[in-house]
Amino acid sequence: MSAEVEYLQHEDYLYRTIKLKEIRELGINPYPYQYADCVEVQEIRNRVVDNELGDSEAAFRKETPKVRFAGRLVLFRSMGKNAFGQILDRDAKIQVMFNRDFSQVAGLPADSEISSIKFIEKKLDLGDILGIDGYLFFTHSGELTVLVETVTLLCKSLISLPDKHSGLADKEIRYRKRWADLISSEEVRKTFLARSRILKLIREYMDQQDFLEVETPVLQTIYGGAEATPFVTTLKALHTEMFLRISLEIALKKILVGGMSRVYEIGKVFRNEGIDRTHNPEFTMIEAYAAYWDYNDVMKCVENLVEYVVRALNNGETKVQYSHLKSGPQIVDFKAPWIRMTMKESISVYGGVDVDQYSEHELRDILKTRTALPEKAYVSATRGEMIALLFDELVCDKLIAPHHITDHPLETTPLCKTLRSGDETLVERFESFCLGKELCNAYSELNDPLQQRKLLEEQMRKKALNPDSEYHPIDEEFLEALCQGMPPAGGFGIGIDRLVMMLTDAASIRDVLYFPVMRRIESK
């Protein structure tokens, strides 16, 4: 029997299927079609003002507000003529009280051999989804409670809930069975509610800045916009090799050429590469492009966007605590403006190396003595490539506060304009870092079609000399679009998953993805 169906042999599953059969024999449908006109538990809580509610006696007289809601039964205990439970929905829990003489089970025949309270005690289980009609009151201890008038079984659960104290202790099980993780852990629910809120706030900010949200193809005949290995598939209808996109960039720039002056897309990107604490092969990005901007305008947009999101999440505060660095917990302030440094300045400040004072041979020696990189990583590297390697190895993990690192070597990208100062060895690119990780990548976008072709062809020549590089053709449609004329523009890309990690104090990217990529469990 395969691992996926082992639960079919669990004693609890078998016991609950017997209950399911008995419930059906009583004439009750354990999986009804709908439960209309119910509200969220949090909405009920928001309505309540202490002095508006009476005690349980007032509820029994039906003098308190009546409510109708639904959720999962996550706690239950019998106490004589009463039984108490907790109902959990998306945002909140609420206590319910079943009473022997007052509470009824929807659909239970009047002449049934089992009473409503016995049905509740014997046929319902933790994990069942219930509809509740009842009356609000406060207990003597001050807990908001619903005296149940009618309970409706909306879904009979056949698998027991995770232990209420330890939840799902095994991380791999948590990631594979996220539904159970969400039920058992309030912190996990908060993380994913925050993720949805972050996406909403990003869209809100971009819309305020007059950006137009667009959609571009996930399946592409030519991939580009980043240095990454794609996932490859075949479109059977056209007998054509296709790729899952590794970036949103090229398609968005084509739209910019078409006259849509400010565009953004939030979407899935796929890279057939490693999996670690901050990388998943399938991840979510926002990329945005604005005509007539340069990378200075983009820097302001990025830091203001992130500050806007952080303030909305944290009641106006811009400081966030992150607990999962090797150096211990850190407080990070996302208030704009962020620290700005050129890449060379950052290597000098954080790495103690003034790269302009060293020859290429000396830079290789520094890489050999001060990093753990294999010799093949730098033995034939250009000066610009070695500067980028020194930054990666000596600087990145020291950038705890938000930084914009500007003016990268030309070799790092073929899609960016060189410095307007005339130094053609550097480009108007910045990357934003926080908590030792890259958060954003941005350019003053190259719109000279002849220079763009030259740089892409040079990139192809270098790849041809490197047996570890994967060849892929130049996107001629993109170059044709540039020939049509793309306005000067600034653009950026932000990894949404990494941003959510930072703002929810998550240790791993898997903690902010509902269903991260996992190794397949083979049949036994």
Curated annotation (Swiss-Prot):
Please report the organism this UniProt entry assigns to the protein: Chlamydia muridarum (strain MoPn / Nigg)
Q: What class of enzyme is it?
A: ligase
A single Gene Ontology CC annotation of this entry is: cytosol
GO molecular function annotations of the record: ATP binding; lysine-tRNA ligase activity; magnesium ion binding; tRNA binding
Q: Which reactions are catalysed by this chain?
A: tRNA(Lys) + L-lysine + ATP = L-lysyl-tRNA(Lys) + AMP + diphosphate
| SS bond partners | none
Which keywords, in A-to-Z order, does the entry hold? Aminoacyl-tRNA synthetase, ATP-binding, Cytoplasm, Ligase, Magnesium, Metal-binding, Nucleotide-binding, Protein biosynthesis
Its recorded name reads: Lysine--tRNA ligase
State the similarity comment: Belongs to the class-II aminoacyl-tRNA synthetase family.
Known EC number(s)? 6.1.1.6
Binding of Mg(2+) 1: at which residues? Answer: 431, 438
Q: Which InterPro entries match?
A: Aa-tRNA-synt_II (IPR004364), aa-tRNA-synth_II (IPR006195), aa-tRNA-synth_II/BPL/LPL (IPR045864), Lys-tRNA-ligase_II (IPR002313), Lys-tRNA-ligase_II_N (IPR044136), Lys-tRNA-synth_II_C (IPR018149), NA-bd_OB-fold (IPR012340), NA-bd_OB_tRNA (IPR004365)
Cofactor binding annotation: Binds 3 Mg(2+) ions per subunit.
